[in-house]
């Protein structure tokens, strides 16, 4: 599979996973860039983190009602199309340093959501930093470098 085809496949899987979550929970929204910046400002985090989360779970009726950190939770989504018999065991994903920083630093205000979109193991789980770290089997650091 070529790189472009692989990237397209990953984006399609992510879209399926996001749609699955949005259908299951009416409190979830896909925030705009401006909304992401507004939420990060409330959390006193810089805008470099705008690409570190995919969804927001509102604890209020609408985005316009968000006034403080208790009004929302940031969510980073990781999707697999692999059949996982004992979900989430066997789930493999990448996590950026920024995503890990938010997960660790915003305990309770940032969650990682793992989703299997395989028809025979269609499930999701939300994890905070502690719940993730106790499940990690292997972890390695990888640098991505552009020249």
Question: What is each PLM-predicted segment?
Answer:
Residues 1-44:
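Acidic-basic catalytic patches of nuclease active cores, encompassing PD-(D/E)XK
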Residues 25, 59-63, 82:
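Alpha-helix capping/termination and helix-coil
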Residues 35-69:
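Active-site metal-binding core of divalent-cation-utilizing nuclease and nuclease-like domains
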Residues 51, 71-73, 108:
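Residues that flank catalytic or metal-binding motifs in active/ligand-binding sites
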Residues 55-57, 71-83:
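Conserved catalytic cores of phosphodiester-cleaving nucleases, focusing on short active-site segments
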Residues 77-79, 97, 117:
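Residues immediately flanking
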Residues 81-105:
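Mg2+/Mn2+-dependent nuclease catalytic core
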Residues 104-147:
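Domain-level recognition of nuclease-like catalytic cores that cleave nucleotide substrates
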